[in-house]
Amino acid sequence: MLTNADREQIIAQYQRGESDTGSPEVQVALLSARINDLQNHFKAHKADHHSRRGLIRMVNTRRKLLDYLKSKDLGRYTTLISQLGLRR
């Protein structure tokens, strides 16, 4: 689970402006952190199907945000996926 300090650190790293919290880069970075936390959760709790549904929803949301960013600005997209280490 992400703490507020972790969340603020991610926002500070990926924000485009001083008060930016909603840009696609920030949203994708926060979703990626939550997805990674849930993947670690599933290593210990394999039968947690309710949370797995939430994980799939987060992955789909992240994919849609990445597709949007790719259509709007390819440079920002490639920079973001290289920073996050995504395999797209």
Curated annotation (Swiss-Prot):
PROSITE patterns given in the database record: RIBOSOMAL_S15
InterPro entries listed in its UniProt record: Ribosomal_uS15 (IPR000589), Ribosomal_uS15_bac-type (IPR005290), uS15_NS1_RNA-bd_sf (IPR009068)
Pfam (any one): Ribosomal_S15
Record keyword Lipid metabolism present: no
Entry GO MF terms: rRNA binding; structural constituent of ribosome
GO annotations of cellular component type: cytosolic small ribosomal subunit
Example GO BP: translation
Tagged with keyword rRNA-binding: yes
Keywords, comma-separated and alphabetical: Ribonucleoprotein, Ribosomal protein, RNA-binding, rRNA-binding
Cystine crosslinks: none
Family: Belongs to the universal ribosomal protein uS15 family.
Chain's role: One of the primary rRNA binding proteins, it binds directly to 16S rRNA where it helps nucleate assembly of the platform of the 30S subunit by binding and bridging several RNA helices of the 16S rRNA.
Subunit organization: Part of the 30S ribosomal subunit. Forms a bridge to the 50S subunit in the 70S ribosome, contacting the 23S rRNA.
Name used for this protein in its record: Small ribosomal subunit protein uS15
